[in-house]
Amino acid sequence: MGQYPTCIHSVISNNPKDLNQFLEKLGSRLEEIELELVVATRVQVCLDEMLSNAIKYGYPPEKTGQIEVSITYETDEIVVSVTDDGVPFDPFTRDDLDSLDLDIEDREIGGLGIHIVKNMASRVDHQRQTNRNINRFWIPLS
């Protein structure tokens, strides 16, 4: 295991193009610091889901917003925080999917991304403070 920086911090707009650029840069950064592949993959998949949700559902089409991403390395886990100025929404309150055993045509639309985050992370948290959604998830380093 390499020596990790204390924090990676970035701000993107609610534009899908910015999301793709951010994820590419993040992948390179996680490679540079030699984060284990399984951990880096979990961070990237969860961030892709959380940021995609914020961009797709958090803003009316005409509103430009800012989404902050903070990745903090602790002793045995990584804490990822996604903070946006979009509409109030707690993605983690949705019930777990009961329809995973059904054929794709019979499943309810939505919720699979958050289901993935909940299963890859050791814990998740949402807060609403000063007109901002603060969503956090924890990824174990081992």
State where each predicted segment sits:
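Short helix-loop "hinge" at the ATP-lid/N-box region of the Bergerat-fold HATPase_c
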Residues: 54-59
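Short beta-strand-loop-beta element adjacent to the nucleotide/active-site pocket used for signaling
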Residues: 72-80
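Conserved short strand/loop->alpha-helix "switch" segment adjacent to the catalytic nucleotide/phosphoryl-transfer site
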Residues: 26-48, 106-108
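Flexible, glycine-/charge-rich segments associated with ATP-binding catalytic modules
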Residues: 1-11, 118-142
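Helix-loop-beta hinge of the Bergerat
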Residues: 4-37
